[in-house]
């Protein structure tokens, strides 16, 4: 639950869901909304896959999914799971035996697709492997691969068909006394996905994995995911998210966190509030923000920073951020700390100075948190 007593219009009441574990990461219940991505390497190339997982983890990925289409992949999975800094989800399609092999290799979670995993007998074999090896399961319904009988029944992918697919497989898991599962009903169509997820949220208390599948490239996919996921998250639906982009998985993680930051659901690192710039700017806002984004990537402590080109909105934005800089005249601007004017700084020295202030503030916050935990 995200409650703000001062600004109640920001409140989001999260849907009540069961809590499960994906490795050491809690999903559902009152756990933070976790951010996932998926590797796009050849899984049998252990080094390349691990390198990508580590880069994703470095920018905050909580969980990483890895495709396991063949035995070479599941053989490689053992070392990948052992060396990965975050839990690994094995992505399974068509071959239920790959799920069994992935569980034996150390996967924290098995993603199965109801549209191609096979009948209940095969699913029961996957359940047994998951139980024996301490894995959770994700029921991953996708509009593009629904079961044939559902397409015949409904005529096309639709929310009813997607939710029916998911609930049918929930019953199989529950009938076999397996409850460590989460579920997704993904589509590339934002309207279809949103409607299916809303219907699903009313039908089960299982943790929900949100995603808009095949969303597109970096720009188009970011926009589509922000609309689809943002809308659902605002409604309180969603326990873990994956932004699907035809781009570096690192970008998926960054976009995922930005969506959560924008809704106040989870923060990581520096949230920069900056203007688009105009003729009034007292310094080059766009170039400054680009530099600051790169130089502040290492900061994991949540905080806010406003970089505004002039005094029209600069002082007002600075009131609501931890650190602010507002452009002025004569090659200098005003630095704000905790919403109050503090001192002037030249434009030439501003970037280095802001980085120093952010690093100092991050250290103070971390020290206070450590002291409180003792």
From Swiss-Prot:
Transmembrane segments: none annotated. One of its GO terms (biological process) is terpenoid biosynthetic process. Binds 1 [4Fe-4S] cluster. Pfam families: GcpE. Pathway: Isoprenoid biosynthesis; isopentenyl diphosphate biosynthesis via DXP pathway; isopentenyl diphosphate from 1-deoxy-D-xylulose 5-phosphate: step 5/6. Its cofactor is [4Fe-4S] cluster. Keywords: 4Fe-4S, Iron, Iron-sulfur, Isoprene biosynthesis, Metal-binding, Oxidoreductase. One of its GO terms (molecular function) is iron ion binding. It comes from the Bacteria. SUPFAM superfamilies: Enolase C-terminal domain-like, Nitrite and sulphite reductase 4Fe-4S domain-like. Its EC number is 1.17.7.3. [4Fe-4S] cluster binds at residues 275, 278, 310, 317. It catalyses: (2E)-4-hydroxy-3-methylbut-2-enyl diphosphate + oxidized [flavodoxin] + H2O + 2 H(+) = 2-C-methyl-D-erythritol 2,4-cyclic diphosphate + reduced [flavodoxin]. It is an enzyme of class 1 (oxidoreductase). Belongs to the IspG family. Converts 2C-methyl-D-erythritol 2,4-cyclodiphosphate (ME-2,4cPP) into 1-hydroxy-2-methyl-2-(E)-butenyl 4-diphosphate. HAMAP family: IspG. This is 4-hydroxy-3-methylbut-2-en-1-yl diphosphate synthase (flavodoxin). It comes from Paracoccus denitrificans (strain Pd 1222). The gene is ispG.
């Amino acid at each position: 639950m995200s409650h703000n007593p001062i600004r109640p219009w920001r409140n989001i009441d999260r849907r009540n869901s069961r809590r499960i574990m994906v490795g050491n990461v809690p999903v559902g219940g009152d756990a933070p909304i976790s951010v996932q991505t998926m590797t796009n390497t050849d899984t049998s190339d252990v080094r390349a896959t691990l390198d990508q997982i580590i880069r994703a983890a470095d920018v905050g990925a909580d969980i990483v999914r890895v495709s396991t289409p063949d035995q070479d992949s599941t053989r490689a999975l053992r070392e990948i799971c052992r060396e990965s800094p975050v839990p690994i989800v094995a992505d399974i399609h068509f071959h239920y035996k790959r799920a069994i092999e992935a569980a034996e290799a150390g996967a924290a979670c098995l993603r199965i697709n109801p549209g191609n995993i096979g009948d209940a007998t095969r699913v029961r074999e996957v359940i047994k492997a998951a139980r024996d090896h301490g894995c959770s399961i994700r029921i991953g319904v996708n509009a593009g691969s629904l079961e044939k009988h559902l397409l015949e029944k409904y005529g096309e992918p639709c929310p009813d068909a997607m939710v029916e697919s998911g609930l049918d497989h929930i019953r199989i898991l529950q009938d076999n006394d397996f409850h460590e599962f989460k579920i997704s009903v993904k589509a590339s169509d934002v309207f279809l996905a949103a409607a299916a997820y809303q219907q699903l949220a009313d039908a089960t208390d299982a943790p929900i994995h949100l995603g808009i599948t095949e969303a597109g490239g970096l720009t188009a996919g970011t926009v589509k995911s922000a609309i689809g996921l943002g809308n659902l998250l605002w409604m309180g639906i969603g326990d873990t998210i994956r932004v699907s982009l035809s781009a570096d998985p690192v970008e998926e993680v960054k976009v995922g966190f930005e969506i959560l930051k924008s809704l106040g659901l989870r923060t990581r690192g520096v949230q920069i509030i900056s203007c688009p710039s105009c003729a009034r700017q007292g310094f080059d806002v766009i170039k400054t923000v680009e530099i600051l984004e790169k130089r502040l990537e290492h900061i994991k402590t949540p905080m806010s920073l406003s970089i505004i080109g002039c005094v029209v909105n600069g002082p007002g934005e600075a009131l609501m951020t931890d650190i602010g800089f507002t452009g002025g005249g004569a090659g200098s601007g005003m630095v704000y700390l905790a919403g109050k004017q503090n001192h002037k700084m030249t434009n030439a020295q501003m970037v280095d100075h802001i980085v120093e202030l952010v690093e100092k503030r991050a250290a103070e916050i971390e020290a206070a948190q450590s002291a409180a935990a003792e």
